[in-house]
Amino acid sequence: MAKGKQKKGKDLNELKKELDIDFHKIPIEECYQRLGSNPETGLTNAQARSNIERDGPNCLTPPKTTPEWIKFCKNLFGGFALLLWTGAILCFLAYGIEASSGNEDMLKDNLYLGIVLATVVIVTGIFSYYQENKSSRIMDSFKNLVPQYALALREGQRVTLKAEELTMGDIVEVKFGDRVPADLRVLEARSFKVDNSSLTGESEPQARSPEFTNDNPLETKNLAFFSTNAVEGTMRGIVIGIGDNTVMGRIAGLASGLDTGETPIAKEIAHFIHIITGVAVFLGVTFFIIAFVLGYHWLDAVVFLIGIIVANVPEGLLATVTVCLTLTAKRMASKNCLVKNLEAVETLGSTSTICSDKTGTLTQNRMTVAHMWFDGTITEADTTEDQSGAQFDKSSAGWKALVKIAALCSRAEFKPNQSTTPILKREVTGDASEAAILKCVELTTGETEAIRKRNKKICEIPFNSANKFQVSIHENEDKSDGRYLLVMKGAPERILERCSTIFMNGKEIDMTEELKEAFNNAYMELGGLGERVLGFCDYLLPLDKYPHGFAFNADDANFPLTGLRFAGLMSMIDPPRAAVPDAVAKCRSAGIKVIMVTGDHPITAKAIAKSVGIISEGNETVEDIAARLNIPVSEVNPRDAKAAVVHGGELRDITPDALDEILRHHPEIVFARTSPQQKLIIVEGCQRQGAIVAVTGDGVNDSPALKKADIGVAMGIAGSDVSKQAADMILLDDNFASIVTGVEEGRLIFDNLKKSIVYTLTSNIPEISPFLLFILFDIPLPLGTVTILCIDLGTDMVPAISLAYEEAESDIMKRRPRNPVTDKLVNERLISLAYGQIGMIQASAGFFVYFVIMAECGFLPWDLFGLRKHWDSRAVNDLTDSYGQEWTYDARKQLESSCHTAYFVSIVIVQWADLIISKTRRNSVFQQGMRNNILNFALVFETCLAAFLSYTPGMDKGLRMYPLKINWWFPALPFSFLIFVYDEARKFILRRNPGGWVEQETYY
């Protein structure tokens, strides 16, 4: 077993390491040689079979899953349920002991109690199982990503194979629309682009080509990865990784192999069980010894021991906690947070660090034109539907020239039948940048289609990674000018070097060094804002060289690509969501650290972080300080910088201590260009600091981090199936602001669970104490076991649940996250208040009512002591009371049952006050008010239920409840009032002397 664990740990540590391969660096000939493949014919069938035998099929290995019955048993026998099962078994044991000793009187009580306890556990176990049945289907969702078929070269023949039959060294062809069937080294490519977003988090499609461009295998252009989508062009590649050894396979192995540990609330409930069990066993054993010393038979003493332990078990609490969490989960679902795991409801409330993805979570995942540069000035683009924010002259020649090039030099088109849809919401064919430009042109001119029709496209060279530009030639809409119009867009520096003139303020002027500097300043400024900048230029081809009908050749350009006229720049960004800055500010005031973890470029990441407030105004990074002081970065003390932007490259070989140093000393952090393994390392680093970590993500690459986090939050709209399976919670609107709502709800439910528990536990003392007096002073039993059940599973249930609806006492988002070590769900102070203070007053109320009724019927209090043996003896039918009246056995038992009923009603009456004081932990009830209508209903409900149980005919047979005289309801009222006054005084002192001894002893 230990060996297996060691092996699993070793495997996971391997998977956590960065991808370390050299297939992208070595010459292609060496690649063929290493893989035993032939560029002309591919593998032979014999080679393929041998490779498959050696490496296995090209598919993901499913992990060992926990059988459903084991999950069900965990719900049925785990945690709190175990305490109730112990109680049930002890009841059956007591029943067995009494049955064997021939004591018929209490037989049925213990039997009923055992059956009811077992039923409660089974019902709540089934309920929890259905609520939390998040059977980890992570691997199933990875299977959905696996391509089904692939076109491969075997023995010189192109054959269609099942993707799982591919093996190392196979040469395959991939075209637009396919999923990449394995990890491939690119041999040749034609305008080939892949969507790596689910793997690396980059929202832009990435061009792939045979050139080696980066040491990092995830960044180089000559590798394409298993299960990513081909979105443009065609490609030929050689298989260098299959199944579990692909990048995707490693992520799958990491996500499914991680051990997630217990949730904070599960730890709290375990801690609570220890306390309750400790109290129960201590009391039970103490009174077992006392009973023995007092001369009771050992069988009686064992029954007493069991009775005390069972009376200590709050039978209704398991159901209360489950229902409270379910209600909060439903409330969160209505606010766009879908909780898959009930315990995650509270985890979000105790979160102290949020590691958020950028694309789609903090931003809109919709590239938008943000700025333009023409006529020598930077202008903010207007992306409003009605153009109400326009800040530039749309009649200027500079703008008209730029927008015409933008409309023509683009392959993006609106999908059909969307004329009634607002422009910003229309779907577009083409990549994200092209779509942004198309929408910008359509918003400002409203006639993209018309411009294209008037200037018919003749020839085009599509964008490719080598040229870094796109160029097209069009007929001129000005029919009097027969010249063809050439338009070009691309990387600004590449466009500028192809231009000899610039169009400025309606005139074409020569490109001077001064103008180049103005261009560079604009380019740097826009780039520094984290925006993706494109340059635009045009040229009217001379009529003498390019007459009407000239045969343009796109493959071997027979037209000029230099000496062009520069028109301007457009810059795009994936803009932040409107609600995010406010949400980040709320997190900060709630003491929650927000860290951005993204696969995007550091400059873009930093710009978005600044715009949403993750890096607050005035806080500098090491680079900012170095730039301000004009010194090298190495001379700046990292601790002087409050903010940090960490490149994924720095994390490749970082030690845990160095990462801890970064996390500890920088309150504001952005991790950029991170890989899936690095996201996981960052989460583990935060957890080492003692933080409770929430992680947001939408890609497959986020799934290991989502699984490892204390709470993983996936995106409902843009999220991949894999990320949704790995997460504990799904944001239905993909909005970071919804997490803050979730944190608020989580904190509120933790506070309210404390209130529910203190309310429920208080009635334990009036339930246990009758039993103790029964043993110590030999009095007739004041409260029966069945009656205890009527309280725990009857009158107390609805009030306890109603506290889940209580409003927050103060702004819970203005305090720091709870410390899991010191701020427990149930602590000594809560036990002291429930048992030692309020519980004692309640017990006094019960005994007062008991003695009043006994005295009224003839048994004065001092005459009850030592009476039990005669009272419980069937043989005694002439027991005399304090006034000389004789009582038969049946009459005595009827009086005893009336006392049980009155004691039960008195507990209900003092629980009125207990429920009202439990509404707040510090504030006065008068401040809080009685706006919780569910709680108001609960007060009426428990009273009506008590009356129903007391006055319904037939209850004397089933529950031994007898109708009470009306005046027997009143003796407990002063005690109820006393509880209210006592607690209001305690809270008044709490508020007047914060941190004083009253707070230290009683504030739970």
Curated annotation (Swiss-Prot):
Q: Which InterPro entries match?
A: ATPase_P-typ_cation-transptr_C (IPR006068), ATPase_P-typ_cation-transptr_N (IPR004014), ATPase_P-typ_cyto_dom_N (IPR023299), ATPase_P-typ_P_site (IPR018303), ATPase_P-typ_TM_dom_sf (IPR023298), ATPase_P-typ_transduc_dom_A_sf (IPR008250), Cation_transp_ATPase_P-type (IPR050510), HAD-like_sf (IPR036412)
Where does the record place the region Disordered?
197-216
One annotated GO molecular function is: ATP binding
EC class name: translocase
- What reaction does this catalyse? K(+)(out) + Na(+)(in) + ATP + H2O = K(+)(in) + Na(+)(out) + ADP + phosphate + H(+)
What keywords is this UniProt entry annotated with? ATP-binding, Cell membrane, Ion transport, Magnesium, Membrane, Metal-binding, Nucleotide-binding, Phosphoprotein, Potassium, Potassium transport, Sodium, Sodium transport, Sodium/potassium transport, Translocase, Transmembrane, Transmembrane helix, Transport
Q: Which CDD domains match?
A: P-type_ATPase_Na-K_like
Positions of ATP binding: K489
Q: By its UniProt entry, which Pfam families does this protein fall under?
A: Cation_ATPase (PF13246), Cation_ATPase_C (PF00689), Cation_ATPase_N (PF00690), E1-E2_ATPase (PF00122)
SUPFAM superfamilies xrefs:
Calcium ATPase, transduction domain A, Calcium ATPase, transmembrane domain M, HAD-like, Metal cation-transporting ATPase, ATP-binding domain N
Highest taxon of source: Eukaryota
Annotated S-S bridges: none
Q: Where does Mg(2+) bind?
A: D698, D702
PROSITE patterns, alphabetized:
ATPASE_E1_E2 (PS00154)
Endpoints of the signal sequence: none
Any transmembrane segments, and where? 76-96, 110-126, 272-294, 301-329, 768-791, 828-855, 897-918, 934-959
The subcellular localization recorded is: Cell membrane
Please report the record's description of how this protein sits within the membrane. Answer: Multi-pass membrane protein
Quick one: where is this thing mainly located? membrane
Q: Which residues form the active site?
A: D357
- Give the Enzyme Commission number: 7.2.2.13
Which terms under GO biological process does the entry name? intracellular potassium ion homeostasis; intracellular sodium ion homeostasis; potassium ion import across plasma membrane; proton transmembrane transport; sodium ion export across plasma membrane
- What family is this? Belongs to the cation transport ATPase (P-type) (TC 3.A.3) family. Type IIC subfamily.
- List the PANTHER family hit by this protein, alphabetically: SODIUM/POTASSIUM-TRANSPORTING ATPASE SUBUNIT ALPHA, SODIUM_POTASSIUM-TRANSPORTING ATPASE SUBUNIT ALPHA
In terms of NCBIfam families, this protein maps to: ATPase-IIC_X-K, ATPase_P-type
Its protein name is Sodium/potassium-transporting ATPase subunit alpha-B
Species source reads Artemia franciscana (Brine shrimp)
